Each structure stands twice: as structure tokens, then as C-alpha cells.
Amino acid sequence: MSEGQKFQLGTIGALSLSVVSSVSIVICNKALISTLGFTFATTLTSWHLLVTFCSLHVALWMKMFEHKPFDPRAVMGFGILNGISIGLLNLSLGFNSVGFYQMTKLAIIPCTVLLETLFFRKKFSRKIQFSLTILLLGVGIATVTDLQLNMLGSVLSLLAVVTTCVAQIMTNTIQKKFKVSSTQLLYQSCPYQAITLFVTGPFLDGLLTNQNVFAFKYTSQVVFFIVLSCLISVSVNFSTFLVIGKTSPVTYQVLGHLKTCLVLAFGYVLLRDPFDWRNILGILVAVIGMVVYSYYCSIETQQKASETSTQLPQMKESEKDPLIAAENGSGVLSDGGGGVQQKTVAPVWNSNKDFQA
């Protein structure tokens, strides 16, 4: 099996793990929040991250992955930003209608595209933009109902969108810049995320629910679903970093909308949640957008791979030409008295090459 095939197989596995684990945790949390009345979402998320860190620490002790420390300030900033984005999303849901909150989630994709275009010079083809538009239109039809606006809720939603986009872009860029795996990044950033939410969680949950998480009556059933939710969250957090590292923040958001459609369908089929033709139409349009997006992404990936493969032989041919080699600094021609000799000279190392255009 070639490296390309292994990478594709790993990407498919990461996407599948993300879908299965995310849908599972939504079902578990729905039972915990809606049925059992445990509405402390931010505090629950801090417990998720704490269990994830402990699980990764055990995996490190068992030598299932290698610890690779890197810039501590980058890790701390990234972890705290991730925690803040989760808290802001929960506040956005608390201070807005469900319909406006869904619009907030839809805004993450165009915001991510805008930020990557402005700051990373990443280009999104018209075909990709078209497929994303179809996807967002479909999810909007399926999920957005009422749009009640208020000033505080709008500001919180804006901050939630920006912090979420930046955090997901950082998840991708940090892995590539410092050459760390998704597991290594998650292991180092988890404590900062957990502490941020552990400190702010009870306050935010109290603000949103008018209840105290420490005064809640923890029955055996509630404890069971909390433990189950925390165990599933290990897979959710791991697959999130894995998907963003292997693909892109935009692809991860597309996957997130697929999960939304699956949860809606699951709620209708098994739980008999209210469902109408608008939901069905929206899901169908969204699925079409996802299929088109996946198709165009695979086509562009193949084109880039073929361009790279055609450039390599040309580079090798240019290295064989002494005149081109001389221009590149890999060799010089000198008169050695009786004839022409070629002397190899190492190219001059420029430490600032990464900062030059």
C-alpha cells in the first residue's frame, strides 16, 4: 500500500470516528440534559477534557505515543482560546433563540474561509465555494426556524464565531508548524482547556440555568450517563484534532453539519421528534452540498498530486545540467590549468529565508 493510500485510509478512518463518536455523545447528552435535567453543559465539558487528559496520560505511560514538548506559550494560548470558544458558544445558545444559534454555527464556515484567505493566502476555488453555499443553504433550511435578535446575544455569537474559527485554524497550523501529531497537541493543550472551563463553568451554568451544579441531586442514573459521556468524549476530542490535522478547519465544519443532519434524522426515526418536509428538504440539499464538496476536494487533491509528480522529474533533470546547477549555487566552473574542473560549493544558508517573499 502506497503512502497516499495509507493517508486516504487514515483520513476516512478519522472522519468515520468523528461522526460515530459525535452522534453517540449527542444522544448520551440528550438523555442527560433533556430527560434527567442535568443542564450544566460547560461544567460537563470541563469534565470531558479532564477525563481526556487522564486517558492520554495513561496512553503515554503505556508508550502508545511519544511526548513532544514545544512552545509552551503557544500551547497555553491555544488551550485557553479553545476553552473560551466553548464557553462563548454555550453563552450564545443561552442568550439567543435556537434559530439564531444555528445561524451562528452556519457562520463559522464563511468566517473560516475569510480568515484563511486574508491571513494565510489560501485559495478556495469557485467550485468549492459553490458546494459550501449549497451545504449551508441546506442546513439553514433544515435547522433555522425563528430568528430573534438581541444586542448581547449578537455580540456573544460574533465572539463565539471568531474564537471558534481561530482555534480551529490554530489546531491545523500548530500541528504542521511544530510537526506534532493530533494526540501530542491534544495531550498538551487539554489541561489549559479543562482549567479554563472548570473555573468558569459553574459560574456560566449558574448564569444560564439559575441552578448550582454542586447542589444538583446526583442519582446513580445521572452519574452513569455523566461517566458514559466523559468516556465517549475522549474519542470525540481525539477525532476532532485528528480530522482538522489531516484535512482542514473547513472540512471539519462540513463534517459537523453532516453530524447535525444525522442527529436530526436519528431524532425523527428513533425518538419521534417533530419533523416536516422543510427538514427533509434541507437535509437532502445539505447532503448534495457535502457530496459536491467531497467530489471537488478529491479532484483538486488529485490535480495537486499530479502537478507535484510532474515537477519532480523536471527538478532532477535541472540538477544534471551544470549551467543550471551553477546558477543555483550547487556548483562553479573554474579553470584548473590543464582543463575545466567542476568544484562543488555548498549553497549559502540564509537563516531569514522564511521571512522573505
Swiss-Prot record:
Topology of the protein relative to the lipid bilayer: Multi-pass membrane protein
InterPro entries: Sugar_P_trans_dom, TPT_transporter
Record localization: Golgi apparatus membrane
GO terms classed as biological process: UDP-xylose transmembrane transport
GO CC annotations, alphabetized: endosome; Golgi apparatus; Golgi membrane; trans-Golgi network
Residues modified to Phosphoserine: 334
Keyword annotations from UniProtKB, A to Z: Antiport, Golgi apparatus, Membrane, Phosphoprotein, Sugar transport, Transmembrane, Transmembrane helix, Transport
Pfam families cross-referenced by the UniProt entry: TPT (PF03151)
GO molecular function, one term: antiporter activity
Membrane-crossing residue ranges in chain numbering: 7-27, 31-51, 75-95, 100-120, 132-152, 154-174, 194-214, 224-244, 250-270, 280-300
Major subcellular site: Golgi
Tissue: Ubiquitous.
Function, in words: Nucleotide-sugar transporter that transports UDP-xylose and UMP in a strict counter-exchange mode.
Homology family: Belongs to the TPT transporter family. TPT (TC 2.A.7.9) subfamily.
Stated name of the protein: UDP-xylose transporter 3
Natural source organism: Arabidopsis thaliana
